[in-house]
Amino acid sequence: MFKLLKIENARMNVPEPVFHEATTAEAISIGEALVLTNGKLTKCAATATPQFIAIGQVGASDANRKVAVCRVESNQVYEVPVTAAPTSLKVGDKVTIHTDGLQVTATTTSGVITIENLNGASAAGDTIVVRI
């Protein structure tokens, strides 16, 4: 999951929550990368730039579809797991988002998430520091 690590040059390290409706029959998890499509939140595609990170959750069959999210801003830095061993990755590489919207891949072709720090990551599931 995308976990906010810090907001650079901000007096408070807490993003302002906003609420949007989730796409019908789609579950959303805390820390998931999201975009608005047709006015509703949906999982971010691998090579799309996330607009929001979920700070609330909703089940696929929940009647209340409103989800708390924070807007993605350029001064935010996140920790996120990588789905494959990041052995060939370097700081500054751009990687894609995994299909679950909660992790990044080690794929740099058409990447949208910039690596800020590898944090000593050497295996799948290890956490790296990124900027969106």
Provide a role label for each language-model segment.
Residues 1-132:
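Surface-exposed, low-hydrophobicity beta-strand/loop segments enriched in small/polar/acidic residues
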